[in-house]
Structures are given as C-alpha cells and as structure tokens.
Amino acid sequence: MVACKPKTTEQTDKPAPAVQTTEYQKMITARVFIKPGKETDFISAAKMMIENSNKEEGCLGYMLYQDPYEETNFIFVEKYVNQAAIDFHFGTSYFKEFGTMISDMTSNPMEIKIYDIAAEK
C-alpha cells in the first residue's frame, strides 16, 4: 500500500476553498489495472501524483492502495471539498502527465467513480 495521511489544516499553506451550502464534499475511487511486471513502475509514477495532489488546496486526501490478492490491481481513494476542486485536479499538468506515463502500463481502462459524501445530505 502506498498512502499519504489526510491533510490537516497545518499541512497546507493555502486555505481550502469555501464549500457552498448546495455542494457536498466528494469522494473518488479510481481502479487501475496494471500489466504484470509493471507494478513497481506504476507505484513510482503514482508517488508523484500523490505528492502533488495532496498539495492542492481543495484536496482533503489522496491515497493509493494495492490489492494484496491481485497485485496488479490498485485503487486511488481521493477526497475533495467540492466539484470545483475535482475539476481543478483534472485540469492540472501533472494529472495529464500521469495519464500519459501510465498508458503503456495499464491492462484495462481505469474505472473512475465520483460520490457525494452522504452524511452531509
């Protein structure tokens, strides 16, 4: 497992964007399927994404987990203050660079799901 602990206020130099009353915090799961033998390369590339993403002011946590039974399967678990923070994340240069870096490592398309934090509804 590769993970970074969720950020606290002390870990960021910028305040998080204000959450509007009609918006909810968001959780993303992104399952990634890697070709056998490419796991170490993928983890190295993912560390860059984890580090940069956790610095985003709207990111509340960005972690990567590896399936212990199917070691070529990974899942990113991401938490954001709102949809605008996700849109910002998807528009960053390192997000696009990461997609290019791992394109030859993946065995199947990534499965991305976005959720509202239900307890806020």
Predicted regions and their residues:
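An amphipathic, aromatic/His-enriched active-site/gating alpha helix that lines ligand/cofactor pockets
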Residues: 8-10, 54-60, 79-113
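A mature extracytoplasmic/lumenal domain signature
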Residues: 46, 66, 78-80, 90, ...
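Short, glycine- and small/hydrophobic-rich beta-strand elements in well-ordered beta-sheets
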Residues: 5, 51-75
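Glycine-rich beta-strand-turn "strand-cap" elements at beta-sheet edges
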Residues: 5-27, 63-69, 100-121
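Acidic/polar helix N-cap motif
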Residues: 35-38, 70, 82
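Post-signal-peptide N-terminal segment of Sec-exported extracytoplasmic proteins
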Residues: 22-60
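Sec-dependent bacterial lipoprotein signal peptides
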Residues: 1-2
